[in-house]
Amino acid sequence: MALLRGVFVVAAKRTPFGAYGGLLKDFTATDLSEFAAKAALSAGKVSPETVDSVIMGNVLQSSSDAIYLARHVGLRVGIPKETPALTINRLCGSGFQSIVNGCQEICVKEAEVVLCGGTESMSQAPYCVRTVRFGTKLGSDIKLEDSLWVSLTDQHVQLPIAMTAENLAVKHKISREECDKYALQSQQRWKAANDAGYFNDEMAPIEVKTKKGKQTMQVDEHARPQTTLEQLQKLPPVFKKDGTVTAGNASGIADGAGAVIIASEDAVKKHNFTPLARIVGYFVSGCDPSIMGIGPVPAISGALKKAGLSLKDMDLVEVNEAFAPQYLAVERSLDLDISKTNVNGGAIALGHPLGGSGSRITAHLVHELRRRGGKYAVGSACIGGGQGIAVIIQSTA
């Protein structure tokens, strides 16, 4: 076994994902985490008093209280004030990283039960004004900086993140048509799964205010199931003339959160938890920042090697859909079986709230693996700046 101790998922929940400026825009990332965490504690019958550690992933600290995020989540859901909390940032891998950190704490016996999670309110990313703190001269041309937009450029390689996907399209000879067809597949798979109720077990509904009054939100808002290939083909490339990346085949800017509670084998027995899955192993890898989207390839390969498993052993595979050409490059590099990869759609359909996607993918794999009667699954994400992360789980059903 890749881990030093048995570590089990005893609850896994996520909020519905809201569209940019949509139904969740007035909730902070902390609020969204609170919803997911409360749902996970309830679903797993986990008393807040039994939680030894809180670890939350978050990328854009977009609210005024964001620096306290993990701590406030723990306190809000009733976890004792003596229990420590940690907010982490491994960009798009932050939700996965919270689980990695939690496993590490359990393996070295610093904790027995850990509330992990990831969250993002991209809608609340502020505009900022730099250089004014210490005074400005008369006539200064003060610029507003969009903190969300500028963060989507890797300044080290001077490339918008989407251009790293364009680089992969060139390298792997991926066409615009292939990207649009894949985007359509993501939307269609999401619709089929949503219509069949496959997301129900992972979903933590939220009460939201609308023009019609308060309503319960329990469906991802960003998805566009009515999308057609013809509509996708009409969209202009955004970052490169004759490029492949469009608004229709890239992941959606979104708001949302997930929570995954993990526990040691000893804690499962002591508290009579119902284990949903075992954490088999994980791996984090670096890669060339100019093709950062290829990160899941070394990450998945490394995780499988550590666990003594192969892709053929996996019943489900999830690769976060940052961009269609990025996903397709990973698919080709690993020779993925499309019948068991991103089976219910991905971030192109339902959105990618940066810190929240790893938790969403993990929660989905936990429940989907059980629903299908499968054994192993691997979830992964590329990471801005040139990294990849992967986590392997085994169903206990």
From Swiss-Prot:
CoA binds at residues 224, 227, 251. CDD domains: thiolase (cd00751). Pathway: Lipid metabolism; fatty acid beta-oxidation. The modification Phosphoserine is found at residues 121, 140, 310, 333. The keyword Lipid metabolism applies. Its EC number is 2.3.1.16, 2.3.1.9, 3.1.2.-, 3.1.2.1. InterPro entries: Thiolase, Thiolase-like, Thiolase_acyl_enz_int_AS, Thiolase_AS, Thiolase_C, Thiolase_CS, Thiolase_N. It holds the Pfam family Thiolase_N. The modification Phosphotyrosine is found at residue 127. One of its GO terms (molecular function) is acetyl-CoA C-acyltransferase activity. It catalyses: an acyl-CoA + acetyl-CoA = a 3-oxoacyl-CoA + CoA; 2 acetyl-CoA = acetoacetyl-CoA + CoA; acetyl-CoA + H2O = acetate + CoA + H(+); propanoyl-CoA + H2O = propanoate + CoA + H(+). This is 3-ketoacyl-CoA thiolase, mitochondrial. The gene is ACAA2.
